[in-house]
Amino acid sequence: MLMPKKVKYRKQMKGRMSGTPQRGVSLAFGEFGLQATECGWLDSRQIEAARIAMNRYIKRGGKIWIRIFPDKPLTAKPAETRMGKGKGSPDSWVCVIKPGRILYEMEGVTEEIAREAFRLAAHKLPIPTKFTSRKDAHEG
């Protein structure tokens, strides 16, 4: 699972997901990409599940880049615990996603294979996504 090696503060506030991302909205490495169309939180397990789904489909054909990293800790209290007594301990890590953020990139495969691999990956994610390519970016 993806998680930071070391953080300054163990626990964070929930925060807000409004607005657009400051960076990470254009393709930087590959030819094709999977772009988020709405905001949400992606868990480290969901990021890994989508990566495995893509790798299984393209086999050894191309290269995949993960453009996101879960750096926000989620806390949880133990089961059957009464309310109060402070905030729970860090449980998992999430990545805050805003609309337009590139989640994954891919190259070394045809567009049809990339589309299908990203479709399989999108089924593992809790947010709606769309396929994007360098060709689309230059035309629009």
Swiss-Prot record:
One of its GO terms (biological process) is translation. One of its GO terms (molecular function) is rRNA binding. Keywords: Ribonucleoprotein, Ribosomal protein, RNA-binding, rRNA-binding, tRNA-binding. InterPro entries: Ribosomal_uL16 (IPR047873), Ribosomal_uL16_bact-type (IPR000114), Ribosomal_uL16_CS (IPR020798), Ribosomal_uL16_dom (IPR016180), Ribosomal_uL16_sf (IPR036920). One of its GO terms (cellular component) is cytosolic large ribosomal subunit. It comes from the Bacteria. The keyword RNA-binding applies. Part of the 50S ribosomal subunit. Belongs to the universal ribosomal protein uL16 family. Binds 23S rRNA and is also seen to make contacts with the A and possibly P site tRNAs. This is Large ribosomal subunit protein uL16. It comes from Geotalea uraniireducens (strain Rf4).
